Curated annotation (Swiss-Prot):
Substrate binds at residues 154, 180, 191, 278, 401, 406. GO terms for biological process: L-arginine biosynthetic process; ornithine biosynthetic process. Catalyzes two activities which are involved in the cyclic version of arginine biosynthesis: the synthesis of N-acetylglutamate from glutamate and acetyl-CoA as the acetyl donor, and of ornithine by transacetylation between N(2)-acetylornithine and glutamate. One of its GO terms (cellular component) is cytoplasm. GO terms for molecular function: glutamate N-acetyltransferase activity; L-glutamate N-acetyltransferase activity. It comes from Gloeobacter violaceus (strain ATCC 29082 / PCC 7421). Belongs to the ArgJ family. This is Arginine biosynthesis bifunctional protein ArgJ.
Length: 406
């Protein structure tokens, strides 16, 4: 049983945070497209970024900023425009976005982080952000997480948020988050953006370590289409407003509980991103055991979840376990094929490298009737374990992406 409980509230569950979202006119549809999350007090700040060499201007801006300072107060996010592959003008637009909101909030510009998502290669209409800044600051509230979550969406069908709370050092500590992502999802920190807030008092370096590990277990273990975005980014702020004794020791129970909370929020958001994958009809959870370490297991799991053949079989309700075995074998992790066991839900398909007789029609019915499909692979006697999440590949995915800018 977890030492924390799930609650509502998203990024405003944590004390001291306000959030909101408005329509600035960036999206031609008129939907909300500008979000703000902020705390009056500087917060310990952590960032995890895309590994794509073609990086959006906000990614480079935040990376450089957080290399120089450990705290930030605000995150500004626009949707409908990625501000990626936009050259010098894009860099200047990211800087001006921070400056505009710094003035509206009464902060210094180096306390404001920025993020963008949308179409790549189109100049960011900074004048719309300039005009909307004060209205967004005025609209931000202590219950505004849902409005912010809506304003960061692009091809997403649903907003994604969650929060947890627990007692740490005798104080109630909250961790909450919002995320967006539906296509171009194969993070190696899709477009995938995630924003985490906490009111925990924690050492900055420790906070960054916790966030990095939580990202590895969650957002770096999901895939929709194998494409890593130019804009993938997770930003996490910890305000200290819970007034718990500051967590300094990475080996302490308090640090362990905080990491559990951050990881739980990240995993929940990551699974919601995959479930909302473009054209997806089911979530695929791939569990791998028996490797030499957890990193190897995670690598195999993500390779299987990423396989277009596996994803197509899941969409077609085809229990083609050979595709699962083949994907595991090309993951680049050594294991003995004679030890491989494969299970689909409750159906044992392969044991000690040998195929098993199973009810193919019943297995197909399991796929047809499940919105979450569980795949289990045992590759050896090791203690390594790993999980990855993917979704099926449907006709609608091609349709959505064939017509994205037309």
């Amino acid at each position: 049983m977890a030492d924390f409980e799930w609650i509502d509230g998203g990024v405003t569950a944590a004390k001291g945070f306000r959030a909101g979202g408005i329509a600035s006119g960036i999206k031609p549809s008129g939907k909300t497209d500008l979000a703000l999350i902020y705390s009056e007090n500087p917060s310990a700040a952590a960032g995890v970024y895309t590994t794509n060499l073609v990086q959006a201007a906000p990614v480079a801006y935040n990376r450089n900023l957080l290399q120089q300072r450990g705290k930030a107060c605000a995150i500004v996010v626009n949707s409908g425009n990625a501000n990626a592959a936009t050259g010098k003008a894009g860099e200047e637009a990211a800087i001006e976005t921070a400056q505009v909101f710094a003035r509206a909030l009464g902060f210094s510009a180096d306390q404001v982080l920025v993020a963008s998502t949308g179409v790549i290669g189109v100049p960011l209409p900074i004048e719309k952000i300039r005009t909307a800044a004060q209205a967004l600051v005025d609209a931000a509230t202590e219950t505004g997480s849902d409005a912010a979550a809506e304003a960061i969406l692009t091809t997403d069908l649903v907003a994604k948020s969650c929060a947890v709370r627990a007692l740490i050092g005798g104080k109630t500590v909250h961790v909450g988050g919002i995320a967006k992502g539906s296509g171009m999802i194969h993070p190696q920190m899709a477009t995938l953006l995630a924003f985490i807030t906490s009111d925990c008092s924690v050492d900055i370096d420790l906070w960054r370590q916790i966030v990095a590990r939580a990202t590895d277990r969650s957002f770096n273990q999901i895939t929709v289409d194998g494409d890593t975005s130019t804009n993938d980014m997770l930003l996490a702020l910890a305000s200290g407003e819970a007034k718990n004794p500051r967590i300094l020791d990475a080996a302490s129970p308090e640090a362990g509980l905080l990491e559990q909370m951050v990881s739980a929020v990240c995993v929940d958001l990551a699974k919601k991103v995959v479930r909302d994958g473009e054209g997806a009809t089911k979530l695929i959870e791939v569990q791998v055991a028996g490797t030499g370490d957890d990193a190897q297991a995670r690598k195999i799991a993500l390779t299987v979840a990423s396989s277009s053949l596996v994803k197509s079989a899941m969409f077609g309700n085809d229990p083609n376990w050979g595709r699962l075995a083949a994907a595991a074998g090309r993951a680049g992790v050594e294991f003995d094929p004679a030890a491989l066991a494969v299970r689909l839900g409750a159906f044992a398909l392969m044991e000690v490298g040998q195929p098993l007789a199973f009810d193919r029609a019943a297995a197909s019915d399991y796929l047809k009737g499940s919105d979450t499909v569980e795949v289990h692979l045992q590759v050896g006697p090791g203690t390594g374990n790993g999980i990855a999440w993917g979704c099926d590949l449907s006709y609608d995915y091609v349709k959505i992406n064939a017509e994205y800018t037309t």
